[in-house]
Amino acid sequence: MQGIIVRIISNLYTVKTDDDLRLCRSRGKFRNMGLTPLVGDKVIIDEKNNYILKIEERKNELLRPRVANIDTCLIVTSLKHPDFSSFLLDKMIVNISSNNIEPIIVFSKYDLLTDEEKKEMNFIINYYKNVGYKVIINTEYDKILRYLKGKVVALTGQTGAGKSTLLNKICPDLNLKTDDISEALGRGKHTTRHVELFDVDGIYFVDTPGFSALDLNVEDKENIKFAFKEFNNDGCKFRDCKHINESGCQVIKDVEEENILRSRYENYKKMVVE
């Protein structure tokens, strides 16, 4: 019988099948193989004894939080209160993309901007769209509802960015108040935190920490450049160009010619050297 692990507490694994939820245990062979079942794992279970027999190959695996097989991550990014931070956004995009997860940028609190601020932010919003990212603002939530059906979705962003508002728009029946996400999805405010998937109208949500908790690993730094969609790596003189100070670098040329947003490039350099 096939299923997906939606909760892990101690050595007990809650597996959602097509028919029901089953409380399962893991075979010792996984420990001997150095393999630990994770929330999000697609598994084969012994229908009679409720043991996990096999863990299917993972499409991705995050270390913090410990979760596997995320399809999409909604990056809820505030434009005001708290103010927009391009570095936090770009760092999250890199982290998500490098883990084979599709990022969707959700710009929140657009309605709080002045006309002058909207002009400035429209340029930035359109830039991200034009280089190939899926982008929505807080007047377009209905666009993603159908797209998310059946997917495992992470929801992340700064504190106060508007995650509750986003969930309310996607699933109005939740009627969330600010900071009530965990409670409404089934997790009490004062319970021990653990990663868990919640089925909300056919969308599996995983509650994740904010931007600061998702850090880049040192070994990933060589691949950071591939997460910047607009970087033309093939145009550089050297195949292993890092786009920092090499001669014949097409990316540096594109920045100087304003084909690449300078703030994006500066954020890239900061991530590479930090």
Where are these regions (language model features)?
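Beta-strand/loop nucleic-acid-binding surfaces
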Residues: L21-P37
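Short, glycine-rich nucleotide/cofactor-binding loops
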Residues: T77-S86
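Structural detector for short beta-strands of small beta-barrel domains
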Residues: M1-I9
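Helix-rich effector regions associated with P-loop NTPase G domains
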Residues: N11, G34-V43, E47-N49, E56-C73, ...
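Canonical P-loop GTPase G-domain recognition
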Residues: L112-A161
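SH3/SH3-like beta-barrel fold
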Residues: Y13-T17, C24, I45, I52
